[in-house]
């Protein structure tokens, strides 16, 4: 049963819809942070600062901050509709990916009946749930209809531009989908007699919470639903904005009225109560998660995420941590992500009921940092102390789950890398090498990450050369072969053919070849004082590297920087792909040979190069593929 449920969760997590939501939310991070900090700077709780904003350049600074908020976090439904649909189009691996955002936005506006005639802006954060549902559904339908339309050859115009044919093939799917959503939206508005039904996200949740009041049961349900939505990539806090207004929007006003009347405040729960004591650092008590990550994480990339996310989490902006780790769709982290705010709700409630902390009587913007917000909300330092206690409780809850998540992450990454090595080995055998960085490769996202890691490792000097001795028939040391080695911090050592393929597809193979040539020459200089006889040092290169116009000039320039007397360099060409011997290539190789550089052909016989190449007399050495000679001993034929 556990294996089956794990398989189901894995399939869901790797589905195109889940991947699109994760990627879309990640791409939206710059706009979320821009909007959050604009809100913080616009509403920072300081009278002197607010006076400055009002009077500076006639209020231009305040208006600018309002504008930045409106076009980013204030238009969150629009931002996520674009990023998620674009991610879906890229995941679908078609040339029509750019049309997905257009179709999704048009479908959403058609469903809403346009932007006019509504009580509120249809791209506000409160509309996120509705917008994401319409976006995903329109993308799924568009993809399926495109597949069906591609079979209709009559839609193809011979001789016309490629983009024209794509547009024509997309015409009917786009019209059908947008018109369909327009009809459904119109039917809903007609049946309910209100345009508000269009925002069915708020409508559904308002009905769910309709019979609940702002008591402990209601607040706990609100916290759980909020974080379940967050876990599935939906901005839960904004989606339930209408619910929070219904449950406890008025509670602080009630408390303030009671205080003015000389009575004790009675309303315990409010939005400020949650923002101040439960949502520390944002959803899921992100600040506790980040601190736990800094304390317990053994992975450098996770610690870096924590360091990057920490400054924004201090102002309760959690997106970097939640989407970067990630927590969403990470079922190992689902338990602490939901459990932590539930526990903090209970501890904060008990503290207030026991009189340890005053009841919240002042509204505080959610962007006000920890400690300051606790003090301002309660008017007492006890509020700040409760925040610290809750923060510690959250850290203790998160620690064991972070350990478990990192273990699973390591095993999954290692498994994918081993699969990439198997795909490369199979491709070398068949003559069809895998394209790791192509969208159609099943582990494309992992390969992209690995290519970036490889490039960064090269820039930091973390790539190494190991040397394999070559002995003569008499047992004397004839030479050494330089072998590329890189120990990835998660996957361990990775097969060199995979690294070369990633560097080639990533566009930095030539930079890598110069890096390795420099490294080999430095090692050769270090070796010179310890040898008396001549020694041949072989350095592997590929035919793809030789295709660069400046390869030979740059290689010769590097080699001539080092004074080598006993160590002779050999450029060993690996026969992993076909090499075209042109007159220009022969002249370039001859120039290096005249400078004392030898050439060797490795793995000859794999089937890529012709035996006629040996007649050109440009190779000083030919190494046969092991498969040609492995069966010679004992073979009577």
Regions found by a protein language model. Give the residues of each.
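Transmembrane alpha-helical segments and their short flanking loops
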Residues: 2-12, 54-55, 59-62, 261-262, ...
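The catalytic core of metal-dependent phosphodiesterases that act on cyclic dinucleotides
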Residues: 558-632
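Early transmembrane hairpin of solute transport permeases
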Residues: 10-153, 328, 342, 348
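Catalytic core of bacterial c-di-GMP phosphodiesterases, primarily the EAL and HD-GYP domains
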Residues: 508-584
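Active-site core of bacterial EAL-family cyclic-dinucleotide phosphodiesterase domains
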Residues: 431-502, 601
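Cytosolic juxtamembrane amphipathic/interface segments immediately preceding
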Residues: 3-25, 61-62, 156-168, 319-322
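Membrane-interface helix-loop-helix junctions at boundaries between adjacent transmembrane segments
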Residues: 96-97, 110-217
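Helix-loop-helix junctions within the multi-pass membrane cores of secondary transporters/permeases
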Residues: 2-10, 250-337
């Amino acid at each position: 049963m556990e294996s089956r449920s794990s398989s189901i969760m894995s399939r869901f997590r790797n589905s195109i819809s889940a991947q699109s939501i994760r990627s879309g939310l990640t791409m939206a991070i710059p706009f979320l942070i821009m909007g959050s900090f604009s809100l913080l700077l616009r509403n920072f709780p300081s009278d002197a600062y607010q006076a400055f904003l009002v009077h500076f350049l006639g209020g231009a600074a305040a208006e600018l901050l309002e504008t930045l908020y409106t076009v980013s976090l204030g238009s969150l439904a629009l931002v996520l509709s674009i990023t998620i649909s674009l991610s879906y189009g890229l995941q679908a691996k078609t040339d029509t990916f750019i049309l997905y955002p257009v179709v999704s936005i048009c479908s959403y506006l058609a469903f809403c009946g346009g932007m006019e005639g509504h009580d509120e802006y249809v791209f506000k954060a409160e509309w996120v749930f509705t917008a994401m549902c319409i976006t995903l559904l329109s993308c799924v339908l568009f993809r399926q209809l495109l597949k069906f339309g591609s079979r209709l050859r009559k839609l193809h115009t011979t001789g016309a531009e490629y983009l024209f044919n794509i547009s024509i093939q997309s015409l009917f799917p786009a019209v059908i989908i947008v018109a369909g959503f327009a009809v459904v939206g119109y039917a809903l508005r007609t049946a309910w007699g209100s345009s508000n039904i269009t925002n069915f996200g708020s409508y559904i949740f308002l009905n769910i919470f309709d019979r609940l009041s702002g008591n402990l049961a209601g607040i706990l349900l609100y916290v759980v639903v909020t974080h379940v939505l967050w876990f599935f990539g939906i901005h839960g806090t904004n989606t339930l904005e209408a619910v929070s207004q219904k449950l406890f929007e008025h509670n602080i006003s009630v408390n303030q009225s009671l205080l003015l009347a000389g009575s004790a405040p009675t309303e315990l729960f409010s939005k400020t109560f949650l923002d101040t004591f439960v949502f520390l650092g944002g959803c899921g008590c992100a600040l506790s998660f980040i601190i736990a990550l800094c304390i317990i994480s053994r992975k450098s990339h996770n610690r870096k995420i924590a360091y990057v996310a920490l400054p924004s989490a201090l102002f309760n902006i959690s997106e970097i941590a939640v989407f970067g780790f990630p927590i969403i769709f990470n079922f190992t982290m689902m338990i602490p992500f939901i459990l932590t705010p539930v526990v903090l709700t209970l501890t904060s409630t008990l503290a207030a009921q026991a009189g340890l902390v005053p009841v919240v009587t002042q509204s505080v913007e959610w962007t006000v940092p920890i400690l300051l917000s606790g003090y301002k909300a309660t008017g007492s330092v006890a509020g700040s102390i409760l925040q610290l206690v809750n923060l510690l409780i959250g850290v203790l809850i998160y620690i064991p789950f972070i350990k478990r998540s990192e273990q699973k992450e390591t095993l999954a990454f290692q498994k994918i890398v081993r699969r990439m090595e198997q795909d490369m080995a199979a491709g070398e055998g068949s003559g069809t090498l895998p394209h790791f960085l192509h969208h159609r490769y099943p582990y494309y996202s992992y390969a992209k990450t690995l290519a970036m890691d490889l490039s960064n490792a090269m820039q930091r000097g973390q790539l190494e050369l190991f040397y394999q001795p070559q002995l003569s028939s008499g047992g004397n040391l004839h030479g050494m072969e330089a072998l590329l080695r890189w120990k990835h911090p998660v996957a361990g050592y990775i097969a060199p053919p995979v690294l070369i393929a990633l560097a080639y597809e990533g566009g930095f193979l030539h930079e890598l070849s110069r890096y390795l040539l420099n490294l080999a020459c430095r090692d050769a200089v270090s070796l010179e004082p310890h040898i008396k006889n001549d020694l041949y040092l072989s350095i592997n290169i590929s035919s793809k590297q030789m295709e660069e116009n400046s390869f030979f000039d740059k290689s010769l320039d590097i080699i001539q920087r080092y004074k080598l007397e006993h160590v002779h360099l050999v450029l060993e060409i690996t026969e992993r792909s076909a090499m075209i011997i042109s007159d220009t290539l022969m002249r370039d190789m001859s120039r290096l040979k005249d400078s004392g550089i030898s050439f060797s052909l490795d793995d000859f016989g794999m089937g890529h190069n012709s035996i006629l190449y040996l007649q050109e007399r440009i190779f000083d050495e030919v190494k046969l593929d092991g498969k040609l000679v492995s069966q010679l001993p004992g073979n009577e034929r």
